[in-house]
Structure formats: structure tokens, C-alpha cells
Design a protein with these regions (language model features):
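Short acidic, glycine/serine/threonine-rich loops at helix termini
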Residues: 2-7, 24-25, 100-103, 134-138, ...
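Conserved active-site and cofactor/substrate-binding residues in soluble primary-metabolism enzymes
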Residues: 5-8, 40-47, 65, 102-110, ...
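Short glycine/serine-rich loop/turn segments
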Residues: 1-32, 91-93, 143, 230-248
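A short helix-breaking turn/cap at a secondary-structure junction
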Residues: 11-106, 111, 169-174
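Short, solvent-exposed loop/turn segments at the edges of secondary structure
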Residues: 6-8, 15, 30-33, 83, ...
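Glycine-rich, small-residue loops and helix-cap segments
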Residues: 114, 118, 122, 132, ...
Length: 291
């Protein structure tokens, strides 16, 4: 949600994991999936979240925490009554990543300086795990996807081929080849590979360990700071079909957004900036779970 929101100049909100029921959603990666919100205004995002959030007897992963009156909390008088300048962190490595557009870097740095001038405490902190985020995310999500999407076999779920079939395996093969797009097939194959006996410990187990390190790090950061800020995406929107030849390039566009998914915290992309190429781009704001 945050990446397309950034590209299109709108607000994109990913709530905390478990804030909104996933009942009715096709499961992709169950420990990551969270329904998000696109909106033109913060008020709309708050109102929609207030309506959608909360317990659901059909989803065991949804949180039972009470749903705050988000739409009331963001009214100006409430903000003025309860808000003081925050302690804000940003990961140094996010602004020095070689893939980050120099103009995006400059505008984010300028914004951080503006916050400091307004009385916010803004501090850079080290984040040595940045380069691990995308590999960890894709190892774990594709592993979960290969399991979740195995139910679409043409018998109990989903599309069923109309071609003549020789046996059950032939039914599976033709059905899944027709029913899944190229990118979905790529992710299923990658997930099946990392879960295979010879590679489970080398990839899946190590990715789980990195995820736990990230959770621990996040807990430490939010014990000292209220917010983490970063660019949402390293570049503005690229041309249609421009990166189709390189799955790796496409995956790396997620370098700033997957962190919140890995650790389950809420994150929002706010469209604050316009690039000299005329395209919008946003600031990503993250806070502790359910904050």
C-alpha cells in the first residue's frame, strides 16, 4: 500500500499487524498480511481505520485491543491538547543507500532539519541490518506463500483448467500454470526452494533469526523514540514495464517499506514532496505497534 501510495501522491497506511481482520482476504504470507488503506486525507484514513479495526471471531490473529476513536484523536484541538514535540529517529543507512535518489535524500534531510527547528529531537541511529531487509522479507513471504497458495489446486479452490487431463498431477500442473501469473509462480517456486530439505536451515531458519533480531532492535528503538522516519521508496515512480526484466530491481524498490512488515509495526506514507521530474514522493512515518 505505501509504495503505490508514494508513487501516486496519496496517503498509504499499513496498520499494526492484527489491527484489522484478515477474514476474506486470500492469504499470501499469513504472518505479514495486513489490510491497508489508501486515502486523500489523514481524516479519511483515520475514519476508515476506525470502522475496519477490531476483533473478529473468524480471524484468530486479529488483536482484541480496544479500537481508539482515531477520527476524534486527529482533530486539531485534540492534537494541540495532547501533543508535544516528539523524539524522532532515522536510520543513517537509509539516507546513504546507493539506490536512493539524491533529490529525495536532500528533501528528506531538509524536512528533518525543519523538525529540529520546530523543537523536535531528531537523531540518527545506526542500522546495520538494512541490506538484510529485502532478502529476509522475500525468503519468509515466499515460503509462506508457497504453502498458502498450494490450496489452489483446481479441486477445492480457485480456477480449474478446461484442458483434457491425463491424471491428477496433470490437473494440478495445467490449472496452476493457467491460474497463476508469472510473478506469483516465481514466488511460489522461490518459497518451495527455501523450504526444501537441503536449504531450509540455510535460508528459512536464518531469515527467521534475522526477523527476531529486527523485532528486538525495534523494541529498543521505541523505548527511546516516538517515531522512525525514512523515505518511503528510493526513487519516484518508474515507467510502466521499465523494470519487468529484473525481479531483483523490483524487489529492491521495497527496501524501506518491508521493515514495518517484518516487525508488525504501523507505517504511513505521507505525500509531502514533489520531485523536479514532476512526480510525487512521500515521507514514511513508523511507530510502535498499536501506537
Amino acid at each position: 500500500v505505501r509504495q503505490p501510495a508514494d508513487f501516486c501522491g496519496v496517503i498509504g497506511l499499513k496498520p499494526s499487524y492484527g489491527r484489522i481482520s484478515r477474514y476474506g482476504l486470500i492469504a499470501y504470507a499469513s504472518s505479514f498480511d495486513q489490510i491497508g488503506i489508501f486515502s486523500k486525507t489523514i481524516e479519511d484514513a483515520a475514519l476508515v481505520l476506525e470502522v475496519m479495526a477490531g476483533e473478529d471471531e473468524f480471524d484468530s490473529t486479529v488483536s482484541s485491543k480496544p479500537v481508539p476513536p482515531y477520527s476524534k484523536l486527529i482533530e486539531r484541538k485534540e492534537i494541540e491538547k495532547t501533543t508535544s514535540p516528539k523524539k524522532v529517529a532515522y536510520f543513517k543507512e537509509t539516507l546513504f543507500h546507493p539506490g536512493l535518489d539524491p533529490e529525495i535524500k536532500t528533501k528528506i534531510e531538509s524536512y528533518l532539519n525543519d523538525l529540529t527547528a520546530k523543537g523536535y529531537i531528531v537523531e540518527a541511529i545506526d542500522f546495520s541490518l538494512l541490506s538484510y531487509l529485502v532478502p529476509t522479507y522475500y525468503v519468509l513471504t515466499t515460503a509462506e506463500a508457497s504453502s498458502n497458495l498450494s490450496r489452489f489446486d483446481g479441486i477445492k479452490f480457485g480456477h480449474r483448467t478446461k484442458q483434457s487431463i491425463a491424471d491428477l498431477n496433470d490437473l494440478y500442473k495445467k490449472t496452476r500454470t493457467e491460474g497463476f501469473g508469472e510473478e506469483v509462480q516465481r514466488r511460489i517456486l522461490l518459497g518451495s526452494f527455501v523450504l526444501s530439505a537441503g536449504y531450509f536451515d540455510a535460508y528459512f531458519t536464518k531469515a527467521q533469526q534475522v526477523r527476531q533480531k529486527l523485532v528486538d532492535l525495534t523494541s529498543t528503538v521505541f523505548s527511546k523514540y516516538d517515531l522512525i522516519l525514512s523515505p518511503t521508496v528510493p526513487t519516484t515512480a518508474f515507467g510502466l514495464g521499465e523494470r519487468n526484466h529484473s525481479a531483483t530491481e523490483m524487489f529492491l524498490a521495497d527496501i524501506y517499506t518491508v521493515y514495518a512488515n517484518l516487525v508488525g509495526i504501523p507505517a504511513i506514507s505521507i505525500p509531502l514532496f514533489t520531485h523536479s521530474n514532476g512526480m510525487p514522493f512521500g515521507l514514511q512515518v513508523m511507530s510502535a505497534s498499536f501506537n
